[in-house]
Amino acid sequence: MLGRPKLVLASGSPRRLALLNQAGIEPDALRPADVDETPTKGELPRACANRLARAKAEAALKSVQLDDDLRGAFLLAADTVVAVGRRILPKAELVDEASQCLRLLSGRNHRVYTAVCLVTPKGSFRQRLIETKVRFKRLSEEDIDGYVASGEWRGKAGGYAVQGIAGSFVVKIVGSYTNIVGLPLYETTSLLGGEGYPIRFGWLNAS
C-alpha cells in the first residue's frame, strides 16, 4: 500500500487483528510465529509474556526479511498471559484445562499481562508490558459446565474470552479492557506512533 510504511502483524489471532482494525489500522500481512508458549520452570507471568512476545517478533522477523515486499516493514507481536498470583494459567485446549481455569478464577481477582513487541524498519526492538486486574463473580457448576460446553474458551489464555459469554462473569476491571482481549490499543498505537508509523492514515475512510 502506497503512502505509508508497511505493517506486519506476527499473529494469527482474529482478536488482535480485529482490535487493530478497530483503531483504523490495517496490517499489510499476517505472519503468525510458531513459538513454544510453555512457561519455563519457575517463570513469573510478566517475564513469560515479555519473553514470548520477543520470541514471536524474532521468529516472524526471519520470515519477513526473506520477503522483498515486506522487508523494512514495521512488525508487531504480542503475547497474553493470565495469572492468579504467580501461577500462569494455560491457553486452554482441553475441557479439563478450561474447567480447572474457571474454578481457579471463580470469585477471585486475577491479572492479565500482555507484552507488545514492535520491530522498527531499522531493526530496533521496542517493548511494553501492560497489566489489567480482573475480578470474576463466583461461578456455579452450571456456569462452568455451560461455558465449557460453549467451546468459546478454546485456545484462550486463562480459558475464557472476555469479549464473549465470559464477559458476564466479570465483576470488575482495573486497567485496559483491550489488554484482556489480547492487544492493549492505547499502548500499541502509542508505540507505533512514537516510532513514526502513521496511525491515523486509515481514519479518513473508517466510516
From Swiss-Prot:
InterPro entries recorded: ITPase-like_fam, Maf-like
Keywords, comma-separated and alphabetical: Cytoplasm, Hydrolase, Nucleotide metabolism
Compartment(s): Cytoplasm
A GO cellular component annotation in the UniProt record: cytoplasm
GO molecular function: dTTP diphosphatase activity; UTP diphosphatase activity
Gene Ontology BP annotations: nucleotide metabolic process
EC number: 3.6.1.9
Highest classification ranks of the organism: Bacteria, Pseudomonadati, Pseudomonadota, Alphaproteobacteria, Hyphomicrobiales
Main location: cytoplasm
Top-level class of the enzyme under EC nomenclature: hydrolase
Family: Belongs to the Maf family. YhdE subfamily.
Residues marked Important for substrate specificity (site): 15, 80, 163
Protein name (Swiss-Prot/TrEMBL): dTTP/UTP pyrophosphatase
Organism in which the protein naturally occurs: Rhodopseudomonas palustris (strain HaA2)
Cofactor(s) recorded in Swiss-Prot or TrEMBL: a divalent metal cation
Catalytic activity: dTTP + H2O = dTMP + diphosphate + H(+); UTP + H2O = UMP + diphosphate + H(+)
Active site (catalytic residues): 79
